[in-house]
């Protein structure tokens, strides 16, 4: 059997999805708190930048993968308007439920779908914009997921990946201290779940760096791939176009 990484642990590929599911079932009800802890609240600015770069227009079809509590979905649904079609999707039932309920509470009526990014249940050339925010690093076969995102994008459509990445070297020591010492402590104190937060920190370190992910997107068939480093490389937004 093939091996892969679950944080710093080496596991069977067939086991990773179950382990990741366990983490997100555990953190679903505290996911927004988790984002605040992991990013010191900066995730709102990173998402706002992503929303601006997506440039969703009225009538657009948008697929939000690993959409979680629906921050991007909400913004996209408002931008696409009543003539648009915005899908809120996640592979994790707990996350999907929390996000769906939150969207409804805010008056956003848009379809929610349980969706595996490695087997996207939509036809070719369907979406104007395909996004995944803070989800790619948890996927077992990132190359397959990227190829699927490209497949369902229309010609001229954009694929966008917002993800924790590799920080600039001067920040590395402080970032490691925060990730491996402070974050698990905060997870234990506020969510009673140090292990899940420890995994999330480890998963960031195992994720491809900015240039490697750019190459992976190009290998998936995307063109004009570029990325923006945000907050000193703590996060990067990658964008590619399907021609």
UniProtKB/Swiss-Prot annotation:
Catalytic activity, EC: 2.1.1.163, 2.1.1.201
One Gene Ontology biological process: methylation
Keywords: Menaquinone biosynthesis, Methyltransferase, S-adenosyl-L-methionine, Transferase, Ubiquinone biosynthesis
Record flagged with keyword S-adenosyl-L-methionine: yes
EC top class, as a word: transferase
Pathway(s) the chain acts in: Quinol/quinone metabolism; menaquinone biosynthesis; menaquinol from 1,4-dihydroxy-2-naphthoate: step 2/2; Cofactor biosynthesis; ubiquinone biosynthesis
Signal peptide coordinates: none
GO molecular function: 2-methoxy-6-polyprenyl-1,4-benzoquinol methyltransferase activity; demethylmenaquinone methyltransferase activity
Domain of life: Bacteria
Catalytic activity annotation: a 2-demethylmenaquinol + S-adenosyl-L-methionine = a menaquinol + S-adenosyl-L-homocysteine + H(+); a 2-methoxy-6-(all-trans-polyprenyl)benzene-1,4-diol + S-adenosyl-L-methionine = a 5-methoxy-2-methyl-3-(all-trans-polyprenyl)benzene-1,4-diol + S-adenosyl-L-homocysteine + H(+)
UniProt: S-adenosyl-L-methionine binding residues: 69, 90, 116-117
HAMAP family recorded: MenG_UbiE_methyltr (MF_01813)
Family listed: Belongs to the class I-like SAM-binding methyltransferase superfamily. MenG/UbiE family.
Function: Methyltransferase required for the conversion of demethylmenaquinol (DMKH2) to menaquinol (MKH2) and the conversion of 2-polyprenyl-6-methoxy-1,4-benzoquinol (DDMQH2) to 2-polyprenyl-3-methyl-6-methoxy-1,4-benzoquinol (DMQH2).
Name this polypeptide is given: Ubiquinone/menaquinone biosynthesis C-methyltransferase UbiE
Species whose genome carries this gene: Burkholderia multivorans (strain ATCC 17616 / 249)
